[in-house]
Amino acid sequence: MLVALVVSSVTCLGVILTSIFNVRFEIKGKTFHVYWMVALLGALIVLFSSLSLSEWWQVLTKSGGINPIKILVLFLSMSLISIFLDELGFFAHLANWTMLRFKKNQISLFVTLYIFVSLLTMFTSNDIIILTLTPFILFFCKNAKISPIPYLVSEFIAANTWSMIFIIGNPTNIYLASSFNIAFTEYFKVMAIPTLLTGLVEFLILFLIFMGKLKDPIQPNPLKLEKENRPLTILGLSVLGICTILLVLSGYFALPMYLISAVSLGALVLLSLIYFICTRTKPSVVGHTLRRAPYEIIPFVIGMFTLVLALEKYGVTQNIANFFGSSGTTFVYGLTSAFSANLINNIPMSVLYSSICNFSSENIRLRAIYSSIIGSNIGAFLSPLGALAGIMWLSILKKYDVKFSYLDFVKYGCTVGVPSLLVALSSLLLFI
């Protein structure tokens, strides 16, 4: 037990430090982040000292219910469909059209961007939306000669709030909900109102914070974008739409969500290749899409899952569940999960809390799960470490010479995040 506890603690500390300082290196122009290597190294040490390969493999690939591999398939498939649309320029064209459509003043632009990001993140991955739209916002604000800070902060917060409404909005939703066989529609019925109320409250807070900056005049200049490939864009949107509908219906027909997303991605790739063959053009979009996939999440999730498995084996997660008790479940699990996400990142936190919830009393388990899901989403904007997107988001801002420090992130994030978290958890009490 001691070995598993020490290795897990040191690994989490290593993940925190390498994430905060964005430790990475390059080999032949390819950038490699170190955080996932730390997680993988810790997992290997635990695997050869505290776990047997057979029990590790059995849990990793269990046929009944959900397992880490199925969750990774679901997340990567949905991410790749979103990246495919991004490679075609769909998000950039849509954002450009939206911003120019409401170009009279910054207030209408601010409202439009918030709604735009909120809608997109519901049906795609919040991380993909953040990483896709951030460079566009920076370019647009530079051309319009306005401060990008109000739009960048609202984009990040909106993406990590409205991602709560559907299971597919965030890999943490996928992991926690799927681990307890919560269906798509069942999840939506519980999370719809808390997400809506939280989104409205945080928008009001954001508006009050940035109201002064939004009074400056705007001088919009259309960005020069490459011509959109209409047939492939229609194909990508059709696949995404059909996939989303099937995910909604999956609970009624006992269709595995990971299988729906994987088949959808396979169909998209196959039909795209047929299109390229028929038009005698290079399938560069497919290649670029596959290269941009967040593959680093695979060793990271499996590594952190291995650490949690060791902690579970030696009763650590059960002791935490016993310590939490059965009173004040919503706020205990919600607040501690949000805090934990900023210590070890929200994906490992979800793996940890999945095990803790599993040991909670049956009469409070659902409340604990949904509270942890809320904490995993809103906790992402309390500090950059809360989510992988936060770390990458800050690195993009540094690349474009935007002055926005770690403390700035915490200041804005906590100002909006703390009341948002309280509203979300309070409204959850109405449904569970």
Language model features: what each stretch is:
Residues 188-198, 330-432:
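C-terminal transmembrane helix pair
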Residues 7-22, 52-57, 103, 132-148, ...:
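Hydrophobic alpha-helical transmembrane segments
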Residues 78-86, 104-105, 116-126, 158-166, ...:
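Helix-loop-helix module between adjacent transmembrane segments
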Residues 94, 128-139, 152, 166-180, ...:
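Re-entrant/interfacial helical elements at transmembrane boundaries that shape
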Residues 56-146, 296-361:
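Membrane-embedded alpha-helical segments and adjacent helix-loop junctions characteristic
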